Amino acid sequence: MTKNNSRCKYCGRILYREVSEKYIVCSSKCKSLIKKFDYIRKVDSIVINLNSYKWSAVEDLSKKVDINKFDFISSIRRLVYFENILKAKERKEINQKSLISIVKK
C-alpha cells in the first residue's frame, strides 16, 4: 500500500495531482465534500455499524443502506487507510469487490 500522505483525504484514492492548496484532495468533487464534517461522521458511523469481524464484500454492505456508493466506498477507504478501524483482505486498491472487516483489538 502507499503512504497515507499520498492519498486523497476524502475518498482515499491515490493522488496523481492536488486540486486544493488547503486540503489534500484528488478532485473538485472531493474538495466540496470534505467540508461536510457532520455528513462524513454520519456515513462513517453507519459503515462501522454495518461491519463485523468476518469478511464482507463492499458491494453487499452497500446494498443494505441508502447511501451514495461513492460516499460509502470513500468512507470505507478512510476507515482502512487513515483510521485503521477496518482492514482489507487484499493489499490492492479498495473497490466494490473488496472484502473488509473490523480490526480486532
For each feature predicted by the language model, list its residue ranges.
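A short acidic, leucine-rich amphipathic alpha-helix
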Residues: 60-62
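Short amphipathic alpha-helical interaction segments
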Residues: 67-78
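Cysteine-rich micro-motifs
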Residues: 21-33
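Short, flexible, mixed-charge glycine/proline-rich loop motifs
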Residues: 1-4, 16-20
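Short metal-binding segments enriched for Cys and/or His
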Residues: 30-45
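Short cysteine-rich clusters marking metal-coordination/redox-active sites
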Residues: 8-11, 26
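Short capping segments at the starts of secondary-structure elements
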Residues: 52-57
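A short, conserved structural fragment
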Residues: 80-91
